Regions:
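Polybasic, low-complexity binding patches
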Residues: 34-44, 52-96
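A generic structural signal for short, solvent-exposed coil/turn residues
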Residues: 5, 16-19
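Short cysteine-rich clusters marking metal-coordination/redox-active sites
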Residues: 13-16, 47
Length: 96
């Protein structure tokens, strides 16, 4: 499914705007939540550096990862009309 995250673009990094080495990031990780991220459009495009390189890449930087999860939760709640409890039922945790 196409991303529901406002401002996401297929050809540039959601975080820094770079247009090189773009990779798709599933906002909610883990086997089950990765599939749910795909199903509900909770993905963003990131450059390789913002995605997978320490210390700033979201897979290494807790603050950046949490911020994307908060953005994803707000987007899902808006798009699907979910409450915090309904979001938690799907993804197992509240990030707000």
């Amino acid at each position: 499914m196409k991303s529901i995250i406002k401002g996401d673009s297929e050809d540039r990094c959601y975080i820094c705007g770079c247009t090189e080495w773009i990779e798709r990031h599933h906002i909610f990780n883990g086997t089950a939540n990765r599939k749910k991220s795909e199903k509900y459009g909770l993905t963003v495009n990131l450059c390789h550096w913002c995605h997978n390189e320490p210390p700033h890449g979201v897979h290494y930087n807790q603050d950046a990862d949490t911020r994307l999860k908060q953005i994803g939760q707000k987007a899902a709640m808006h798009e699907y009309g979910w409450t915090v409890d309904e979001f938690r039922e799907v993804f197992g945790k509240n990030y707000l």
